[in-house]
Structures are given as C-alpha cells and as structure tokens.
From Swiss-Prot:
Protein function: Insulin decreases blood glucose concentration. It increases cell permeability to monosaccharides, amino acids and fatty acids. It accelerates glycolysis, the pentose phosphate cycle, and glycogen synthesis in liver.
Species of provenance: Lophius piscatorius
Keywords: Carbohydrate metabolism, Disulfide bond, Glucose metabolism, Hormone, Secreted
SMART domains given in the database record: IlGF (SM00078)
This protein's name: Insulin
Compartments where found: Secreted
Gene: ins
Length: 51
C-alpha cells in the first residue's frame, strides 16, 4: 500500500484516474483538495471519490 502523500492539482487528478480507472470519479475540489492536498491522503481516501 502506498504511503500517504500530498497530492495537488494535476498530480491529484492523475492519481484519481489511476485509482478509479474505468469507473471514473466525481471531482469535488473542495473536499478532495482539503483531504489530499492540504493534508496527506492514501489510496483508500482516493477510492472514496470514485463513481
């Protein structure tokens, strides 16, 4: 499992594409930026944003 890390901007979007794949994801900038850019998050946090 990847360690928690800060993901911002295009890095965050790229990570969502990798984690969610064909399911896609709903991009809620306020929630995910707060969770993954301002604080470190992990792959399980990212999966919460997949469709």
């Amino acid at each position: 499992v990847a360690p928690a890390q800060h993901l911002c901007g295009s890095h965050l979007v790229d990570a969502l594409y990798l984690v969610c794949g064909d399911r896609g994801f709903f991009y809620n900038p306020k929630g995910i930026v707060e969770q993954c850019c301002h604080r470190p998050c992990n792959i399980f946090d990212l999966q919460n944003y997949c469709n």
